[in-house]
């Protein structure tokens, strides 16, 4: 492990993360190691978030450890955003918990004078990403969506409704095209990942699929 990574994961990590976030304002895009979860106050030393990622209403963001958020992505936590352990979010992805797509027509020029909480037609809804879900670059997740654990959201996918665990979702609008358990089954044919697989209970299902006719 590189010296810098060891320092990030040491007791100095929290302070180094704060300094890195400050320097990010003046530097080219880079990954910031470590993040203090606003909800729990815990330091996620293995989480990495790009210096160019935008977090809206950060105090309503709950984020697990081992999370990766790449360059120029938007995390809108206005109505509550939960990103569970191990999720990865590609570049230029957008996760939104509120929107004004109807409200601007209904309120017209009055829109800017009405507080967010009172705007009629405003779209609101918390978003949750289940553990070890991958969100491809350029994908958009709309307000109110819950995505299960172990999912694969393809590049450029628009997710407008809930997604069950272990789903493969692609397209605009996004549609379920398969299961990551079937994808992972192919890897289990080459090597046994029982020890490291993120969800031990799913290993039984994968192995059952290996023996299915």
Where does each model-flagged region fall?
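Terminal amphipathic alpha-helical/low-complexity segments used for targeting or macromolecular assembly
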Residues: 1-39, 45, 86, 99-105, ...
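Hydrophobic, membrane-inserted alpha-helices
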Residues: 47, 67-69, 153
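Short linear motifs in intrinsically disordered
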Residues: 38, 158-159
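Outer-envelope exported proteins of Gram-negative bacteria
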Residues: 84-92, 150, 154-156, 166
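An N-terminal domain-cap segment
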Residues: 38, 43-44, 55, 61
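Flexible, glycine/small-residue-enriched loop-and-beta-strand segment within the central core
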Residues: 51-63, 68-145, 172-173, 179-181
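Short, functionally important structural connectors and interaction interfaces within domains
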Residues: 35, 47, 53-55, 119, ...
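Short beta-to-alpha loop/turn elements within the nucleotide-binding domains of ABC transporters
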Residues: 145, 156-157, 163
């Amino acid at each position: 492990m590189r010296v810098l990574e060891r320092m990030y994961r040491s007791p100095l990590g929290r302070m180094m993360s704060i300094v890195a976030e400050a320097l990010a304002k003046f530097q080219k895009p880079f990954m910031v190691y470590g993040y203090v979860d606003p909800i729990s106050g815990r330091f996620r030393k293995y989480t990495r978030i790009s210096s160019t990622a935008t977090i809206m209403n950060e105090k309503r963001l709950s984020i697990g450890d081992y999370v990766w958020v790449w360059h120029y992505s938007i995390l809108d936590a206005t109505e509550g955003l939960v990103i569970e352990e191990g999720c990865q979010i590609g570049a230029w992805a957008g996760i939104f918990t509120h929107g004004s797509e109807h409200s601007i027509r209904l309120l017209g020029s009055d829109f800017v004078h009405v507080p967010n909480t009172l705007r009629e037609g405003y779209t609101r809804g918390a978003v949750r990403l289940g553990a070890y879900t991958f969100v491809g670059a350029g994908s958009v997740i709309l307000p109110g969506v819950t995505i299960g654990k172990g999912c694969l959201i393809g590049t450029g996918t628009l997710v407008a409704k809930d997604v069950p665990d272990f789903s493969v979702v692609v397209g605009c609008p996004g549609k379920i095209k398969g299961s990551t358990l079937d994808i992972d089954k192919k890897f289990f044919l080459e090597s046994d990942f029982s020890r490291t697989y993120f969800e031990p209970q799913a290993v039984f299902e994968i192995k059952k699929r290996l023996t299915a006719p």
